[in-house]
């Protein structure tokens, strides 16, 4: 894999000011040793989201069994399951005064249930402690197992999301252990068995063509996916898949308009957009 010598030379539209008004959530998450993808993923929108009372929590540890070339989460042998985690997450969301929580996780292919039971218990614990909180669950693919997907659906989060991440041609390179059609079918199945809002996300700048992006939008909409996010890929390190191109803002706007014309209920498209950006807005759509 080639190293991108220009990885540190980002265009001006990708530069953001250092966050300075999210101390409360930051301190609590550090004190309680909570895994937030906001921090571990170095999200550029961390201050904006946390100030709005929105945060993304990662369950089932911080070591993933998969080795996606775009992702900054550690790969290896995960730790043992913390069966108290659902209650811990729920309690801390309450004291943080979170209004809308996004729950995600590492892949746990080492477990028979791939972590689905902890997933279900976490959703239930959060809802039990605060009925008014809204939830988005950004789930792994569970290798397409419907019995495991059903566990999530049965707890009725407001939004269930699963990211396709990239176009079909690049999936094997970027998401080594994932499958493009499997990801599409996970979301398609959720829509077939429920009225829960579905969502996906893709990254640009990996070497995809315009035609491939548009086809991915079509594939997503054909699966009745309601919401899509489109953002610029930024390589976590020189060991990861390198950025082939920084996409200018007007191209993101173009894709936003195309996606809306296809019938998506909501589209977030821009260089700094990440999967959970403006997530709280997605529950108020008609």
UniProtKB/Swiss-Prot annotation:
GO molecular function annotation: 4 iron, 4 sulfur cluster binding; lipoate synthase activity; metal ion binding
Reaction(s) the record says it catalyses: [[Fe-S] cluster scaffold protein carrying a second [4Fe-4S](2+) cluster] + N(6)-octanoyl-L-lysyl-[protein] + 2 oxidized [2Fe-2S]-[ferredoxin] + 2 S-adenosyl-L-methionine + 4 H(+) = [[Fe-S] cluster scaffold protein] + N(6)-[(R)-dihydrolipoyl]-L-lysyl-[protein] + 4 Fe(3+) + 2 hydrogen sulfide + 2 5'-deoxyadenosine + 2 L-methionine + 2 reduced [2Fe-2S]-[ferredoxin]
UniProt record similarity statement: Belongs to the radical SAM superfamily. Lipoyl synthase family.
Cellular component, GO annotation: cytoplasm
Organism: Karelsulcia muelleri (strain GWSS) (Sulcia muelleri)
EC number assigned by the record: 2.8.1.8
Key words of the record: 4Fe-4S, Cytoplasm, Iron, Iron-sulfur, Metal-binding, S-adenosyl-L-methionine, Transferase
Domain Radical SAM core, first and last residues per copy: 50-265
Name of the protein in its database record: Lipoyl synthase
Pathway connected to this protein: Protein modification; protein lipoylation via endogenous pathway; protein N(6)-(lipoyl)lysine from octanoyl-[acyl-carrier-protein]: step 2/2
Ligand binding ([4Fe-4S] cluster 1): 38, 43, 49, 276
């Amino acid at each position: 894999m080639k190293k991108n010598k220009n990885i540190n030379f980002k265009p001006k539209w990708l530069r953001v000011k250092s966050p300075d008004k999210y101390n409360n959530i930051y301190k609590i998450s550090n004190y309680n040793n909570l895994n937030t993808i906001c921090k571990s993923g170095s999200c550029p929108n961390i201050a904006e989201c946390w100030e709005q009372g929105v945060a993304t929590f990662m369950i089932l540890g911080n070591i993933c069994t998969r080795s996606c070339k775009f992702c900054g989460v550690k790969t290896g042998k995960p730790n043992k399951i913390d069966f108290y985690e659902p209650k811990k997450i729920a309690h801390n969301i309450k004291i943080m005064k979170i209004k809308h929580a996004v729950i995600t996780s590492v892949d746990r292919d080492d477990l028979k249930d791939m972590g689905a039971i902890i997933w279900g218990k976490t959703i239930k614990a959060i809802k039990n402690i605060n009925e008014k909180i809204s939830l988005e669950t950004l789930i792994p693919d569970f290798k397409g197992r419907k019995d495991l997907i059903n566990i999530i659906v049965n707890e009725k989060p407001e939004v269930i999301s699963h990211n396709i991440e990239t176009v079909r041609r690049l999936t094997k390179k970027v998401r080594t252990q994932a499958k493009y059609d499997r990801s599409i079918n996970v979301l398609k199945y959720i829509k077939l068995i429920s009225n829960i809002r579905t969502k996906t996300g893709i990254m640009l700048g990996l070497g995809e063509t315009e035609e491939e992006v548009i086809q991915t939008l079509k594939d997503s909409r054909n699966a009745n996916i309601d919401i899509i996010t489109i953002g610029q890929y930024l390589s976590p390190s020189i060991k990861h898949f390198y950025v082939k191109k920084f996409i200018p803002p007007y191209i993101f706007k173009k894709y936003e308009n195309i996606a809306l014309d296809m019938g998506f209920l909501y589209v977030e498209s821009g260089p700094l957009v990440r999967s959970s950006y403006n997530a709280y807005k997605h529950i108020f759509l008609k």
